[in-house]
């Protein structure tokens, strides 16, 4: 069977949707209302179980690189174990559904009992499915499991590094650790020197984390933005204003804002900043 690692997210989400709706329909069918829910539940549960089998296969194919990340192994194993429990429970559900379909004409009473059993086991399967999803989410969001390595593209890995440095720097700033924030934004700028957004962040850090308006002005002088890009021009202009203020040059900051107001007369933020300086 081919390696399904890169397909794990898609397969998992199909399995979750099919199995959740399948269990819901099976319980509705037991009420005797909405006759279509009985056959629909059988189809959804059988197809969903197939998806669960493939989800475990794709997850097993994907777990190697994720498990080797320091500190992630236990989270990977826990997610994998819940995934296997989910698969096994729904294999039991699928077996009950197949038996119920096979006995429907011979013994309606037995078939009914089998569908009740399917509904009960389906509840247990639903709990296991929730746990597998919860631990899968923890693996991705708390350990970056699989993030940036899905296709083996170095560009994706670099994006992961960029995101990690950015969030670490922002967290340091939130914790009022200016020295750490400045260090991380500086590292970001060293690793991604050609990224305009990163250069803006590094200049902002000179102002906010180091209170070095002169260095920020020097960095801005080396940065050019497209004249037809309003968003970048505004960001450049506001950073220049902040840099002038940090350097103790409020008159230059006001002159910069006045020029921005002439260039972008409809931007309320410029007017608000002018009012603050005045």
Regions found by a protein language model. Name each.
Residues 170, 204-208, 238, 242, ...:
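Residue-level recognition of tetratricopeptide repeat
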Residues 136, 152-191:
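Alpha-helical segment of the N-proximal tetratricopeptide repeat
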Residues 1-18, 49-102:
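Membrane-embedded alpha-helical segments of integral membrane proteins
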Residues 175, 209-210, 247:
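Structural motif corresponding to the intra-repeat A-B loop/turn of tetratricopeptide repeats
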Residues 159-160, 193, 228-231, 265:
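Short coil turns that delineate tetratricopeptide repeat
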Residues 45-50, 110-135:
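Internal/C-terminal transmembrane anchor helices
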Residues 198, 233-236, 270:
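TPR alpha-solenoid repeat register
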